Curated annotation (Swiss-Prot):
One of its GO terms (biological process) is defense response. GO terms for molecular function: ADP binding; ATP binding. ATP binds at residues 91-98. Residues 337-354 have a biased composition (Polar residues). Possible disease resistance protein. It comes from the Eukaryota. The keyword Cytoplasm does not apply. This is Probable disease resistance protein At5g45490. Keywords: ATP-binding, Coiled coil, Nucleotide-binding, Plant defense.
Amino acid sequence: MPSKNLQQAVLTNEFTTNFITTCKDWLDVNGLAKGNLEKKRDDNEEEERLKTESKLPGHDIHGFDNEIKSLQHFLLDQKVRREFKSLVIVGEYGVGKTALCQKIFNDEAVKSVYAPRVWVSMENKESKEGLDGKICVLKKILKGLGVEELILETISTDAKQEFKDNEEVASNQEAGEIDRETEKEKELSALLYALHLNLRWKKYLIVFDDVRENDNWDEKLDAKLKEDEKWGKYLSDGFPKGSGGRVIYTTRDENLAKNLVAQKHEIHRLWPLSDHQSVWKIYDAVVKDKQKESPRNDKKCIDELMNKSRGLPLAARLLAERDPVFVDDEVGPVGSTHGQTDSSNRQPANQASS
């Protein structure tokens, strides 16, 4: 008859094997496996984007203490309190960019210093061709500042009318005097002017979450107007300088990040978590929140969770959505299958882009 130690070793091995299989299945289902993420980057495929909000994520954030302190310093540094500053947070899907920004956006010290604060989810189902993308984002900011839809419609109508009037009188003007601005350019200029007025003399904080190349939001906001250029042509015209305004972007695109800021130190790269315990805490918190019993947290399981999630907080949370895997000598929740997980119960989790 096998010894008790041998039986326990066999059970532990079965548990670890089941845990590994569970992890792999969930990563494949939710597109978080390393190969799937690399394919997304290679194919540049545009999966459906979800709208994000400024409210706290609803769960504790583990492993980002240094990143939180860095963002607090960026926003609360008194030495540059009147300068306009921008920062880009770059990282892969599921690494926690959105959750990190939600955390700092709702920080009490930040809230006491910045007003207004505007959260802009770059998710948008409208046209983004030409200037449409920029116009759509500007309207989102203005709505976040309390500007009514009627005023935005009036701006659009006035721009169309001005363009039409210019076309009618163009034939009576000399070539050098013709206003060659398009209808969209006039609307963009008017929206930038409205934004400038709403932000002037204010210490504002604006977060642009999940910026992508096809959004056409790809200009440096700290650029200064040149003497020979007309005001209202560039996005930077809408963001007043000298009152301590701050802008934070999140993106997965390293090349786009370089177009959004002037200096390399203004790009903050967010890497997957390297702390095994932080990843386990994320996983365990979801399991407990679902009122399930946590699987054993021995070193093998923690290491396997780290290996399969690759340190991505979203992957750890998704893995926890499954029924925990139990070995025969552990007591699982009522209705659970000891030592295995029924694949027929697999339910996709609600994912929040980050």
